[in-house]
């Protein structure tokens, strides 16, 4: 599936038209928000309608309303899916969410080209996702530095130990995401965070991604060394996403005593 998505993305890049930039782009520090979380673990809450493996996750999809609910519940950042064909996202969702909330916004897509980096800036993203399994390490490094030169931060995602090692042989990203889901098989296990987190330098922000749906999961990935987590599907499947965030942290509604 990953290879198919990347082939589609290469086709899309060939015809990419850059949008007009936002009149005033106010950068919101992404890594800093995760280093100073509002709770025991930083939360990047994801706005996500569908996925290739699960189909439609949230039929009543209002990205702005969802993002505002996440912000009210104390999310440290918002992730917005912008891939259209496989995740039923849209780049206009990113711009709309950025204009509606006051926390940093991450663009979640399969970014493989410098034009997509420029596009992300124009859409108002504060950070972008770069997927280690989707890019040669030298290309990832080039896109990473291009992004930072334009004022974008990067969440560099890995799943396999070999991918992590290839990236760290070239440079040290500030934010490293450990995807608990194998993008080739879609098998998910929190053991990925347990395995990879000890290999990452303490200077990096470690984000555990995928497979987190309960307070026990939150405590587990924290014990493995994660400082933040990216959660989408388990929140999006619940009717009230604001209450879902509270429950994820083992709280009564609005009670952050934990």
UniProtKB/Swiss-Prot annotation:
Belongs to the TrpC family. The keyword Lyase applies. It catalyses: 1-(2-carboxyphenylamino)-1-deoxy-D-ribulose 5-phosphate + H(+) = (1S,2R)-1-C-(indol-3-yl)glycerol 3-phosphate + CO2 + H2O. SUPFAM superfamilies: Ribulose-phoshate binding barrel. It comes from Geobacillus kaustophilus (strain HTA426). The gene is trpC. It is an enzyme of class 4 (lyase). Pathway: Amino-acid biosynthesis; L-tryptophan biosynthesis; L-tryptophan from chorismate: step 4/5. Its EC number is 4.1.1.48. InterPro entries: Aldolase_TIM, Indole-3-glycerol_P_synth, Indole-3-glycerol_P_synth_dom, Indole-3-GlycerolPSynthase_CS, RibuloseP-bd_barrel. One of its GO terms (biological process) is L-tryptophan biosynthetic process. It holds the Pfam family IGPS. This is Indole-3-glycerol phosphate synthase. One of its GO terms (molecular function) is indole-3-glycerol-phosphate synthase activity. Keywords: Amino-acid biosynthesis, Aromatic amino acid biosynthesis, Decarboxylase, Lyase, Tryptophan biosynthesis.
């Amino acid at each position: 599936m990953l290879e198919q998505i990347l082939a589609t993305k290469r086709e899309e890049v060939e015809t990419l038209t850059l949008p007009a930039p936002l009149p005033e782009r106010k950068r919101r520090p992404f890594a800093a928000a995760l280093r100073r979380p509002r709770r025991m673990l930083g939360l990047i809450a994801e706005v996500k309608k569908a996925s290739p493996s699960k189909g439609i996750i949230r039929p009543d999809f209002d990205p702005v309303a969802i993002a505002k609910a996440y912000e009210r519940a104390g999310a440290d950042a918002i992730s917005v899916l912008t891939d259209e064909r496989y995740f039923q996202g849209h780049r206009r969702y990113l711009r709309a969410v950025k204009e509606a909330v006051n926390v940093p916004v991450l663009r979640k897509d399969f970014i493989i080209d410098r034009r997509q980096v420029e596009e992300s800036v124009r859409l108002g993203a504060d950070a972008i996702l770069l997927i280690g399994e989707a890019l040669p390490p030298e290309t990832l490094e080039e896109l990473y530095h291009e992004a930072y030169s334009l004022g974008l931060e990067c969440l560099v995602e890995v799943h396999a130990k070999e991918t992590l090692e290839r990236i760290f042989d070239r440079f040290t990203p500030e934010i490293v995401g450990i995807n608990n889901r194998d993008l080739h098989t879609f098998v998910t296990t929190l053991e990925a965070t347990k395995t990879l987190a000890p290999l990452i330098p303490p200077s990096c922000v470690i984000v555990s991604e995928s497979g987190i749906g309960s307070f026990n999961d939150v405590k587990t990935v924290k014990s493995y060394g994660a400082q933040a987590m990216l959660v989408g599907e388990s929140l999006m499947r619940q009717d009230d996403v604001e209450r879902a965030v509270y429950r994820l942290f083992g709280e009564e509604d609005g009670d952050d005593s934990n």
